[in-house]
């Protein structure tokens, strides 16, 4: 790591902590339902929304009622997003006259945005109208994030309640999360990004003449975007000359803000946050990274405040930060090292005052190695998936890091809400293991952890590895899966493993070398995204309901402290161990083999 990388990482974590602490305390008030001083006007708006919807806000929900309401709301959201895409050609705010999106791509995109994954098998600026981007996709960026916060609130109430039958009201949690947290933050970040040059308009795309025409070759494709191959299976190339360039416009800043704050990640443009209209400067890049981690980090303090012991929140945040710093150091070091293939060509990859050095393939020169590597770690530690560089061009160990961060279960800060409740599931597993070692019934925050909680926790932990490994196995076995591989060998396998890892863990980033906009991958990845999201949420709500019914016991001499360095070390060990055990064989076939092959020559 260079001194620049170290300084950037320290500055990032310092600013994050300074902002996340007060936000976490504020979110605790939102979760508790208490009145917030100075925001009486928002309370009036909130109550007006309840009256408009005919909701009884005093009606408490059991965990089953909460889960049903959540599933119904998100299913209706998916149907709405699907319908908007399928009717896009006849709807307004479509200056480029884009046609209707295909059924399989619409299905994949609807599930993707509702599940907070934002996997994109399409190019936003060449597929989606402004209305689709704003009404369907940006809308779900808010609602999917609010759903995650609501589930986190419900689980926290399970720990903090005493012999309660309710874990809250889903509709209230959804409304308050959107109104008090997501909307205000999105407005602030949108304005900040516009100040840095992120565009926000409804203009038609602009056609401009190039100063120098560009002649280039590209693989020929069919009408549906599939590569044309010759008799030997090699891609057929065609020579093209570009004299004009079409510059895409659109309401980008408003979508960019919630894309980051909600750990959604779906870009307005195909290049995502590598595009200069989404992320034009190093300062906008820093803002976007902060926005990704801000709410997940703040929720750790929310957890501590709502359970009545801030040390618990610090312990969870400490475990997350420790893993994050180690993994970020690996990707920074890996990307700063010289690429052997470039060395063989005599390319200068040393770090100087005039260049970042290292592996600059697939990276933006305005960001360089340090900011690109940090963004890579941030976006995959959180279930965001936005990218400011091409992950497919990372060094083998550089690509190993985002894969592993996702395979930990997106609990290293993780998504909005999902990171906290995912880490709390690992905390439950940790105290259970500790209880087995000392022969005592495990407790966490005064609640006994018994067989029911462990069964539900096991389901929540195992559902995503099952989806990832089974999906990857099917894709490499069937012809429709193998035809999408552009890079044979270990890297091609890594691309498929990355796709299913990203989908099942609701991240959304990709190794872009995989041709994933096909009926096979659109369907398979949509299944992984849906069950990766909701097959985890339901058992977590079941745990919340079970814990809420229990008395909160006072700590005694035999109670294991869950706020000190020993527990943090145990929690980190359990997260790493479960991730390693689940995925080591698959990782050995992908990035590890690729690393050995690259450096063996």
From Swiss-Prot:
Pfam families: KdpA
GO cellular component, one term: plasma membrane
Stretches that traverse the bilayer: 6-26, 65-85, 136-156, 179-199, 283-303, 313-333, 367-387, 397-417, 419-439, 458-478, 524-544, 566-586
One annotated GO molecular function: P-type potassium transmembrane transporter activity
InterPro entries per record: KdpA
Keyword terms of this UniProt record: Cell inner membrane, Cell membrane, Ion transport, Membrane, Potassium, Potassium transport, Transmembrane, Transmembrane helix, Transport
Location in the cell: Cell inner membrane
Keyword set includes Endoplasmic reticulum: no
Assembly and oligomerization: The system is composed of three essential subunits: KdpA, KdpB and KdpC.
NCBIfam families referenced in this protein's UniProt entry, alphabetically: kdpA (TIGR00680)
PANTHER family: POTASSIUM-TRANSPORTING ATPASE A CHAIN, POTASSIUM-TRANSPORTING ATPASE POTASSIUM-BINDING SUBUNIT
Entry's family note: Belongs to the KdpA family.
Entry protein name: Potassium-transporting ATPase potassium-binding subunit
């Amino acid at each position: 790591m260079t001194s620049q990388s170290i300084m950037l990482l320290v500055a990032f974590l310092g600013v994050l902590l300074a902002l996340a602490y007060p936000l976490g305390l504020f979110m605790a008030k939102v979760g508790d339902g208490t009145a917030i001083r100075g925001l009486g006007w928002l309370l009036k708006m909130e109550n007006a929304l309840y009256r408009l919807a005919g909701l009884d806000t005093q009606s408490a929900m059991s965990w089953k009622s909460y889960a049903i309401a959540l599933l119904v709301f998100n299913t209706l959201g998916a149907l709405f997003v699907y319908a908007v895409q399928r009717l896009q050609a006849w709807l307004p705010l479509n200056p480029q006259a884009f046609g209707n999106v295909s059924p399989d791509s619409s299905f994949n995109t609807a599930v993707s945005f509702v599940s907070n994954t934002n996997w994109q098998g399409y190019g936003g600026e060449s597929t989606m109208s402004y209305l689709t981007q704003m009404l369907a996709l940006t809308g779900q960026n808010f609602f999917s994030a609010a759903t995650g916060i609501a589930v986190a609130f419900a689980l926290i109430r399970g720990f903090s309640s005493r012999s309660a039958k309710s874990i809250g009201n889903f509709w209230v949690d959804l409304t308050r999360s959107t109104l008090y947290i997501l909307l205000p933050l999105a407005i602030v970040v949108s304005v900040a990004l516009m100040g840095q040059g992120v565009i926000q308009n409804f203009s038609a795309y602009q056609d401009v003449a190039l100063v120098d025409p560009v002649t280039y070759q590209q693989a020929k494709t069919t009408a549906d975007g599939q590569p044309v191959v010759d008799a030997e299976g090699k891609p057929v190339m065609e020579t093209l000359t570009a004299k004009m360039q079409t510059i895409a416009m659109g309401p980008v800043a408003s979508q960019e803000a919630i894309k980051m704050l909600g750990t959604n990640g779906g870009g307005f443009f195909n290049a995502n946050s590598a595009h200069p209209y989404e992320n034009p400067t190093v300062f906008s890049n820093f803002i976007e990274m902060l926005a990704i981690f801000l709410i997940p980090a703040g929720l750790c303090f929310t957890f501590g405040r709502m359970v009545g012991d801030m040390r618990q929140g610090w312990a969870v945040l400490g475990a997350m930060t420790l893993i994050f710093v180690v993994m970020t150091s690996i990707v920074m070091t890996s990307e700063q090292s010289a690429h052997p293939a470039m060395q063989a060509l005599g390319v200068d990859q040393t770090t100087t005052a005039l260049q970042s050095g290292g592996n600059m393939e697939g990276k933006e020169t305005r960001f360089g190695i340090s900011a690109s590597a940090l963004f890579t770690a941030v976006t995959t530690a959180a279930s965001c998936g936005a990218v400011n560089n091409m992950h497919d061009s990372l060094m083998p160990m550089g690509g190993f890091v985002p894969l592993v961060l996702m395979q930990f279960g997106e609990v290293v800060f993780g998504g909005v809400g999902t990171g906290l409740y995912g880490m709390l599931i690992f905390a439950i597993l940790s105290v259970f293991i500790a209880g087995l070692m000392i022969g005592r019934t495990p407790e966490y925050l005064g609640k006994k952890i018994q067989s029911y909680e462990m069964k539900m926790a096991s389901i929540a932990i195992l559902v995503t590895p099952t989806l990832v490994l089974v999906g990857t196995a099917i894709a490499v076995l069937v012809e429709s899966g193998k035809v999408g591989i552009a890079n044979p060998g270990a890297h091609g396998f890594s691309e498929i493993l990355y796709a299913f890892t990203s989908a099942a863990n609701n991240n959304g980033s990709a190794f872009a070398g995989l041709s994933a906009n096909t009926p096979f991958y659109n369907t398979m990845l949509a299944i992984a995204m849906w069950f990766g999201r909701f097959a985890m949420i339901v058992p977590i709500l079941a745990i919340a309901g079970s814990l809420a019914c229990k008395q909160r016991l006072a700590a005694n001499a035999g109670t294991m402290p869950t706020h000190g360095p020993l527990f943090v070390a145990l929690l980190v060990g359990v997260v790493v161990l479960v991730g390693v055990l689940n995925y080591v064989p698959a990782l050995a076939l992908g990035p590890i083999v690729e690393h050995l092959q690259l450096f063996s020559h």
